[in-house]
Amino acid sequence: MTSSNDIRATFLDFFARNGHEVVPSAPLVPRNDPTLMFVNAGMVPFKNVFTGHEHRPYVRAASSQKCVRAGGKHNDLDNVGYTARHHTFFEMLGNFSFGDYFKDVAIENAWTLLTRDFGLPKEKLLVTVYHEDDEAASLWKRIAGLPDEKIIRIATDDNFWRMGDTGPCGPCSEIFYDHGPSIPGGPPGSPDEDGDRFIEIWNLVFMQFLEEPAGVRNPLPRPSIDTGMGLERFAAILQGKHDNYDTDTLRALILASAEVSHTDPDGAHKVSHRVIADHLRATSFLIADGVLPSNEGRGYVLRRIMRRAMRHAHRLGMREPFIYRLVPALTRQMGVAFPELPRAEALIVETLKLEEQKFAVMLERGLSLLEDEVQKLGSGEKLPGAVAFKLYDTYGFPLDLTEDALREQHRGLDHEGFTASMAEQKARARAAWAGSGDAATETVWLDLRDRLGGTEFLGYSTEESDASILAVVVNGAPAGRAEAGQEVALILNQTPFYAESGGQVGDTGTLTAPGVTIRVTDTQKKAGDLFVHYGTIEEGEIAPGNSVHAEVDHARRGAIRAHHSATHLLHEALRRALGPHVTQKGSLNAPDRLRFDISQPRPVTGAELRAVEREVNARIRENAAVETRLMTPDEAVKRGAMALFGEKYGDEVRVVSMGAGDAGRSAYSIELCGGTHVARTGDIGAFRILAESGVAAGIRRIEAVTGEAALAATEAETDLLEEAAAALKVAPAELPARIAALLEEKKRFERQVAELQRKLATGGAAAEIEEVAGIKFAARNLGEVSPRDLKSLADSILKSMGSGIAALVSTAESKASIVVAVSPDLTSANNAVTLVQAASGVVGGKGGGGRPDMAQAGGPDASKADEALAAVRALIKP
């Protein structure tokens, strides 16, 4: 059987032999394309090449592109698992010509590859062409020898491709495979075309027009080719399958799911195994490409995919995290073709496991609430949209999971009601936001940006300059003038002040003119590239058109530069210490500290932190030059620069390099960055890590300081050690041993105290045994005795009595803890649970629990401990 890996290799090798550049798959997160959530087709990474906005050193390309369709126009999520060919993740094989060859070569390449290299029988193939594309029909007849009946003309948009309302467009030609008359379905264009007999395997797009406004089409001067073949669909044909989920890669994941869950891969749980196999691929590749689960944007879509898979794991009977255990099986199948998968495997596993743990709690609660609501419905009645929205909004239960659960019961959902509830909530949120004044202020910045243009930033080369005031904003509105004492927001024509972005805080400083001083307390970026200087006029008055001298706080900027450059060294040191899965997830570069968030599935150990700290300080001591160059994003990435996930880059980027290179790299750290940096690494001075913590699933935070702050942190720790050593009368080096000895001594004393308390409690209780309704009863308020000792004390008292009831109360930590013990011969009339619940009510508790012979409870009101014991006494029956 031809494996999926072999098919991919054969496809790419064929086009490499035919002069194509084999381009690695781009990440699933599109670069500089806000119109797309994820890459959803093979041509997406080449979009700017087709439109002429980007130039590459080749005119022919081939790729196997990772794609995800799980939102927006291309949303296959709801169908995944229930059909033979729907997926959230798939591979798109494609070849592309950027103004080089056109229809004839594209058709010849496709026909040769399919019939010669892959060995498909010619009689099994037929094609469609756009009904006006006589040229393509003629070429298919000449090159492939296809008769007219196997060249089907289609008049719909299915055979005419557009990039958008305007832009490149052109006719398509689709190649179909005929499974034969034993499979139901008709040829494309027929009433039965939705059957499975004729399967589209390859789409050739002939970009030959430019769509202008008003629907005018003009010929492109250099026509191009874009083709796409779904690997999973094509593998099914070559492997003799009628279902993509029966192909080697997906089948291996289905079998792994069945093995771990101890269920039949093809029985009642068939759909669930298919969903898990598909969603495992989408989840793993998205995490490998930098997406982590969250409640917004791409992270939200990822979480939806993950939770749908987890819902099906629940249907398999899995109550513990399970899907994360399938990641190694995926890496074995696809890790060679996509090395980012094994690199990020640890992060994928840990992220999945944490999400599964959290989701298990939410799922049980959500399904229980949903079942309660369904019980209220009549036969065939839809679930009200307001109920579904409450599950979604209040309990975090996704709508698609509600729909999945209802589908199993053959019930519908009131989508209109859900949409209405969602709209009501958004309206409330909009009203609250508009009332805050933020909406009006944002409009001001947009209007000023349209009128004044962007601000020219001079701060890379200077920290002071002359400038003109273009606008004065007071209380969120443009003003003609402002005077001493007023808080203002100013727009200048040019500025040395850095506006907060990329994790670096905004500059502070002064704006001065004769008789005028403005203290700038912050600089922010609005409406894209409008720099807003916030501050207070200390003397004089200002108006638009005035000239000022802008001067940044030099010492503060220097400290910020040091921290920002240190984050670059820290980033690389962490990647080398922990692995290439480490990527930046957030940062703060302030004058007094730095904060750096990374993708990392587990806490960073103390030993690892010390190694990273030593590495960064070694690079600082090198005192290597920090170099900044401007280049295209593609050139930067080729040079080894790290492009940060979520950042938007223009046609030209700043690449910051620092530290001596090794292992074929031109520098130790190479990153795309728009911030300000030191001139040499030695200018950082020193580096000290202060803390490491978790901030979200799969994300760890490093906090550190540089320069004098790093030295101060070291001195403070030294002073603390010396103070502790002096208090314990040992040398600092002997502190660990002395502390260990003290802790052991403390444990010994605690054991002795507990034993003395136990003896006092049991001894005193024995002396105070009373008789109630003919039954021995011992009741004691034990004060500060630990609540965890109450059960053993009650048991000891009961043993000393032989037959009877013991009730004990602890008031440690100003709370009442109660235990009631009843000998077995008395439990039929005196249940310990009933007795302790009565006591709990007295001290403000909400009940209690346990067994008929031993139960415990508690409450916040320790002052009523004796009354609680009296409540037990009052309920004792003979």
Curated annotation (Swiss-Prot):
<feature type="binding site">
    <location>
        <position position="564"/>
    </location>
    <ligand>
        <name>Zn(2+)</name>
    </ligand>
</feature>
<keyword id="KW-0694">RNA-binding</keyword>
<dbReference type="GO" id="GO:0006419">
    <property type="term" value="P:alanyl-tRNA aminoacylation"/>
</dbReference>
<dbReference type="InterPro" id="IPR003156">
    <property type="entry name" value="DHHA1_dom"/>
</dbReference>
<feature type="binding site">
    <location>
        <position position="673"/>
    </location>
    <ligand>
        <name>Zn(2+)</name>
    </ligand>
</feature>
<dbReference type="InterPro" id="IPR018163">
    <property type="entry name" value="Thr/Ala-tRNA-synth_IIc_edit"/>
</dbReference>
<comment type="function">
    <text>Catalyzes the attachment of alanine to tRNA(Ala) in a two-step reaction: alanine is first activated by ATP to form Ala-AMP and then transferred to the acceptor end of tRNA(Ala). Also edits incorrectly charged Ser-tRNA(Ala) and Gly-tRNA(Ala) via its editing domain.</text>
</comment>
<dbReference type="InterPro" id="IPR045864">
    <property type="entry name" value="aa-tRNA-synth_II/BPL/LPL"/>
</dbReference>
<keyword id="KW-0436">Ligase</keyword>
<dbReference type="GO" id="GO:0008270">
    <property type="term" value="F:zinc ion binding"/>
</dbReference>
<dbReference type="GO" id="GO:0005829">
    <property type="term" value="C:cytosol"/>
</dbReference>
<dbReference type="InterPro" id="IPR009000">
    <property type="entry name" value="Transl_B-barrel_sf"/>
</dbReference>
<keyword id="KW-0547">Nucleotide-binding</keyword>
<dbReference type="GO" id="GO:0000049">
    <property type="term" value="F:tRNA binding"/>
</dbReference>
<dbReference type="GO" id="GO:0002161">
    <property type="term" value="F:aminoacyl-tRNA deacylase activity"/>
</dbReference>
<dbReference type="GO" id="GO:0004813">
    <property type="term" value="F:alanine-tRNA ligase activity"/>
</dbReference>
<dbReference type="GO" id="GO:0005524">
    <property type="term" value="F:ATP binding"/>
</dbReference>
<dbReference type="InterPro" id="IPR018164">
    <property type="entry name" value="Ala-tRNA-synth_IIc_N"/>
</dbReference>
<dbReference type="GO" id="GO:0045892">
    <property type="term" value="P:negative regulation of DNA-templated transcription"/>
</dbReference>
<keyword id="KW-0963">Cytoplasm</keyword>
<keyword id="KW-0067">ATP-binding</keyword>
<keyword id="KW-0648">Protein biosynthesis</keyword>
<keyword id="KW-0479">Metal-binding</keyword>
<dbReference type="InterPro" id="IPR018162">
    <property type="entry name" value="Ala-tRNA-ligase_IIc_anticod-bd"/>
</dbReference>
<keyword id="KW-0820">tRNA-binding</keyword>
<protein>
    <recommendedName>
        <fullName>Alanine--tRNA ligase</fullName>
        <ecNumber>6.1.1.7</ecNumber>
    </recommendedName>
</protein>
<dbReference type="InterPro" id="IPR002318">
    <property type="entry name" value="Ala-tRNA-lgiase_IIc"/>
</dbReference>
<dbReference type="InterPro" id="IPR050058">
    <property type="entry name" value="Ala-tRNA_ligase"/>
</dbReference>
<keyword id="KW-0862">Zinc</keyword>
<dbReference type="InterPro" id="IPR018165">
    <property type="entry name" value="Ala-tRNA-synth_IIc_core"/>
</dbReference>
<dbReference type="InterPro" id="IPR023033">
    <property type="entry name" value="Ala_tRNA_ligase_euk/bac"/>
</dbReference>
<dbReference type="InterPro" id="IPR012947">
    <property type="entry name" value="tRNA_SAD"/>
</dbReference>
<dbReference type="Pfam" id="PF07973">
    <property type="entry name" value="tRNA_SAD"/>
</dbReference>
<feature type="binding site">
    <location>
        <position position="677"/>
    </location>
    <ligand>
        <name>Zn(2+)</name>
    </ligand>
</feature>
<dbReference type="Pfam" id="PF02272">
    <property type="entry name" value="DHHA1"/>
</dbReference>
<comment type="similarity">
    <text>Belongs to the class-II aminoacyl-tRNA synthetase family.</text>
</comment>
<dbReference type="Pfam" id="PF01411">
    <property type="entry name" value="tRNA-synt_2c"/>
</dbReference>
<feature type="binding site">
    <location>
        <position position="568"/>
    </location>
    <ligand>
        <name>Zn(2+)</name>
    </ligand>
</feature>
<keyword id="KW-0030">Aminoacyl-tRNA synthetase</keyword>
